[in-house]
């Protein structure tokens, strides 16, 4: 006899859709508190199973990964944006693309990127005046776009930066889980969907313009874009410009926003915890002095590392991930039907008191070697895990640390909001602009 996981029955037909739309974060927390680590419910007509225990998560992402694909839920939501890019592609095609692109994120390449990251950060900070109030999350989104454009695609985004940032923001907002329209087909002409369609057209125009401009160059840099174009132009492959477009969209939309959020949440957390901030600043002074940070400095900055780790635990930019079972499966003592959508929320696991004492408090000092060794493998997974872990994990962590270090060398950040609140879009977005006053140090 099949034993389904426990969970809320919700309303007839709608199931738990309305409570999830109203507040997905509280809903996740309530499910975990009331029903445990494995919870089944109905959302928008789909069987959803929340899995929130490290042991089960490891089975899904590693041990039994072949039985859990990306699935129709993610394809319905994201297929328009990233097509067959790395995020959604599967099987042999995914393996080939992953192997093709992975070298661009090896240590040798990252070392070359580091100087560009610091240069772009200093250029952005040059626009700030001591005593002024800035919208930190917006500034950092512009910065990470500029860094990504220069390091991975070899072009200066300055002229199109504002348009590109607005386009990316509009696309992300289309997937705010707290809006009913998110669960409607993209072709339905709601105001949000119309804005989304315009943004998608803008995205495609920018990407194809970048491809055309690169092909017209006589001497182009050896970067991610060059690797992609060479693969498409190779007669031995079946890749097309549409493949190229999908991978560029995946990297841009998947990379710049999560990094900007990690930076935002690290800087605001430090601003609200003066003791932790003082420790990081003292470490930067001791190791760097007045020098710019380099990639070789990062191992000597453990307090900076802990500050970033703790911010990504407390406010994980990727707050959940999804899989779909491609056959009936057993998770723990429960049966999961074929075609169920699994939601695996970092939001719940990262705030679980079984793994993290005082889980809702920012405590970077918790990140000792002994503590990390004691953690279950998937109690902390800000970059997903298994063979499909984020391809840009090293790039994103290095970028976040270099940017935070560079900015702290120049400014103090006075957080202007009483506290952060969040919106569940493609990533963990601030519900309102993050205003900070910057003061030179």
Language-model features: where?
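Cytochrome P450 heme-thiolate monooxygenase catalytic core
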Residues: 70-75, 93-94, 109-261
């Amino acid at each position: 006899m099949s034993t389904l996981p426990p969970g809320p029955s919700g309303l007839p037909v709608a199931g738990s859709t309305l409570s999830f739309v109203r507040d997905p974060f509280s809903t996740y927390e309530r499910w975990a508190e009331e029903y445990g680590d494995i919870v089944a419910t109905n959302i928008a007509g789909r069987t959803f199973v929340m899995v929130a225990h490290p042991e089960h998560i490891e089975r899904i992402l590693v041990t039994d990964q072949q039985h859990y694909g990306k699935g129709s839920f993610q394809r319905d939501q994201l297929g328009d944006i990233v097509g067959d890019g790395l995020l959604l592609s599967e099987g042999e095609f995914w393996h080939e693309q992953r192997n093709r692109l992975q070298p661009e994120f090896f240590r040798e390449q990252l070392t070359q990127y580091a100087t560009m990251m610091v240069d772009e950060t200093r250029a952005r900070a040059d626009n700030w005046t001591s005593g002024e109030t800035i919208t930190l999350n917006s500034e950092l989104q512009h910065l990470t776009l500029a860094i990504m454009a220069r390091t991975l695609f070899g072009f200066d985004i300055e002229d199109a930066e504002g348009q590109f940032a607005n386009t990316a923001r509009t696309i992300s907002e289309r997937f705010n889980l707290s809006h009913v329209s998110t669960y409607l087909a993209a072709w339905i002409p709601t105001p949000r969907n119309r804005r989304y369609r315009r943004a998608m057209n803008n995205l495609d125009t920018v990407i194809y313009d970048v491809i055309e401009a690169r092909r017209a160059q006589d001497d182009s840099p050896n970067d991610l874009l060059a690797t992609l174009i060479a693969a498409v132009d190779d007669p031995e492959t079946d890749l097309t410009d549409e493949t190229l477009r999908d991978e560029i969209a995946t990297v841009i939309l998947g990379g710049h926003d999560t990094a900007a959020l990690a930076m935002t949440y690290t800087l605001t957390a430090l601003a609200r915890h003066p003791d932790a901030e003082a420790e990081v600043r003292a470490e930067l002074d001791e190791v760097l002095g007045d020098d710019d940070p380099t990639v070789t400095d990062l191992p000597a900055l453990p307090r900076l590392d802990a500050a970033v780790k703790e911010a990504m635990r407390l406010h994980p930019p990727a707050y959940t991930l999804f899989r779909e079972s491609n056959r009936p499966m057993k998770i723990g003592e429960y049966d999961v039907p074929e075609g169920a959508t699994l939601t695996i929320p970092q939001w719940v696991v990262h705030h679980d008191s079984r793994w993290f004492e005082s889980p809702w408090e920012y405590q970077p000092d918790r990140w000792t070697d002994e503590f990390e060794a004691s953690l279950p493998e998937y109690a902390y997974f800000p970059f997903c895990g298994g063979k499909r872990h984020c391809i840009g994990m090293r790039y994103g962590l290095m970028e976040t640390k270099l940017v935070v270090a560079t900015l702290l060398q120049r400014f103090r950040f006075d957080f202007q909001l009483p506290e952060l609140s969040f919106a569940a879009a493609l990533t963990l977005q601030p519900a309102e602009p993050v205003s900070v006053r910057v003061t030179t140090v």
